[in-house]
Amino acid sequence: MNPRRKKRLTIILAISAGLAAVIGLVLYALSQNIDLFYTPSELVEGKGPDKIKPEEGQRLRIGGLVVPGSVQRDPQSLKVAFKLVDNGGHLVTVEFDGILPDLFREGQGIVAQGTLKDATTVAAFEVLAKHDENYMPPEVADATNGMHFKPEYTEAQLKGSKQ
């Protein structure tokens, strides 16, 4: 092999090795962020066999059932805090500053998108409620595994809705 071909082969192999290393590092860095959906149990315990937990400040989506009696509204603003649960029994607090969807109720499935504040608190910038009484996002349906709570209303709530 003459020196010119040897030099070309060396350059091509070096570029190929560098490109493979860059692609490998990018895929490794993205491996923890490919799946953004978490259930309350996965958020607390970690996801997958490696028990990978999201970092504080990371954007994510979390889905579960709103715990009855956990909704707390700030009377001075639109801030709302509520707890989510799944079949693992872990609770995660979701804080949201905005108008909740009309179909948002305690005991119903929701998906919230936001950032992780601490190990069990998500600051949501979007809250999605389920469509109708039969629809539940597949991710939430798998996570809750039939743990749907039927909403219970007080007499005052029932009378207030008929006005």
UniProtKB/Swiss-Prot annotation:
Q: Which InterPro entries match?
A: CcmE, CcmE-like_sf, NA-bd_OB-fold
Please indicate the ranges of residues that lie on the Cytoplasmic side: 1-8
Q: Which GO terms describe its cellular component?
A: plasma membrane
GO molecular function terms listed in the Swiss-Prot or TrEMBL record:
heme binding; metal ion binding
Q: Name one GO biological process term.
A: cytochrome complex assembly
Q: Keywords, A to Z?
A: Cell inner membrane, Cell membrane, Cytochrome c-type biogenesis, Heme, Iron, Membrane, Metal-binding, Signal-anchor, Transmembrane, Transmembrane helix
Compartment(s) where it occurs, according to its Swiss-Prot or TrEMBL record:
Cell inner membrane
Instruction: Give the signal peptide as a residue range, or say none if absent.
Output: none
Described purpose of this protein according to its UniProt entry? Heme chaperone required for the biogenesis of c-type cytochromes. Transiently binds heme delivered by CcmC and transfers the heme to apo-cytochromes in a process facilitated by CcmF and CcmH.
Q: What is this protein called?
A: Cytochrome c-type biogenesis protein CcmE
Query: What is the source species?
Result: Aeromonas hydrophila subsp. hydrophila (strain ATCC 7966 / DSM 30187 / BCRC 13018 / CCUG 14551 / JCM 1027 / KCTC 2358 / NCIMB 9240 / NCTC 8049)
